[in-house]
Amino acid sequence: MGDLRVACIGAGYFAQFHYQAWAQISGVDLIASVDMDMSKARATGLAAYDNTEVMLRDAAPDIVDIITPPQTHFDLIKLALQSDVRAIICQKPFCRDLDEARRAADLARSAGVPLIIHENFRFQPWYRAIKQVLDEGGIGAVQQVTFRLRPGDGQGATAYLDRQPYFQKMKRFLVHETAVHWIDTFRYLLGDPASVFADLRRLNPVIAGEDAGYILFAWPDERRALFDGNRHLDHGAKNTRCTMGEALIEGTGGTLTLAGDGSVALRKFGAAAGTVIHGAEDWQGFGGDCVKALQTHVIAGLIDGAPFENMAHEYLHVLEIEEAVYRSAASKSWEPVSGTV
């Protein structure tokens, strides 16, 4: 089998991490870039297009990597499914809303083409290390998890303009764009929650959506997880965007602490100090090279038949939880997660 041919749709800010990662993965031939701004597509050094349909016809990729805003996803997925692709990867937030995401997932399932959502935080090396400890029972029975989001990029009239200016116009922001990462990560670590409670705030008046809030997740066995997010505030790290914050995973037998440099320490119950079980590294890519880790995972699935994480139909559970969060913020009460997807 020859190298798998990959084409990327989108060449905006975050797309750079996708292109860089694909270029480092063996068994991959990165062949084309599509963007409405042809100059951005050309800047990648690949065959450049401003028309996805033409690219699919001329380049004939095996994998299409969609790195565009949510309102474009459904039409691009539909176009890709009409060509002879072996897999589609789609960035999050996935589609405009849950209904559109369901329709996209159904189309891919009917076509027999894997549609994998590029939700990469669960692939960050510190969460993989934490998951291994939990699976091995290293901190006993987990009772609670806390993540404090503190990227420090949300203050003032110029917030987000240097990287992703469309953030300012999103009517649903903190949860839909950012906290959704931890909705999926909490699912990865603890399974699907049964209900949620949310208190959301908009602190920066120049943006349309919420930029701070608390989200409490509950499981039937009395486990709890707390997402405590505030994009105005920072945390003690040289790069506040490495982990985006700090976490505690607490169990009856010990506590795991995630620091802002990506290191994870384990303190056994009753001990005064902990031991670093996952050290910080000088990761070159975003978030501990999680983009590359996800892409490598997809390649392994296509070549070796390894099961895919983040298949679109499974990821719909994340969107259902997100909807419950917004319902809770509006009702100011606990909201059940329906589990109907």
Regions found by a protein language model. Give the residues of each.
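N-terminal Rossmann-like dinucleotide-binding module
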Residues: M1-T44
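Contiguous beta-strand/loop segments that form the cofactor/metal-binding neighborhood of enzyme cores
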Residues: I183-S263, K292-D304
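Core-facing hydrophobic residues within beta-strands of well-ordered domains
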Residues: V28-L30, V85, V142, P193
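Conserved SAM-binding strand-loop segment of SAM-dependent methyltransferases
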Residues: L46-T52
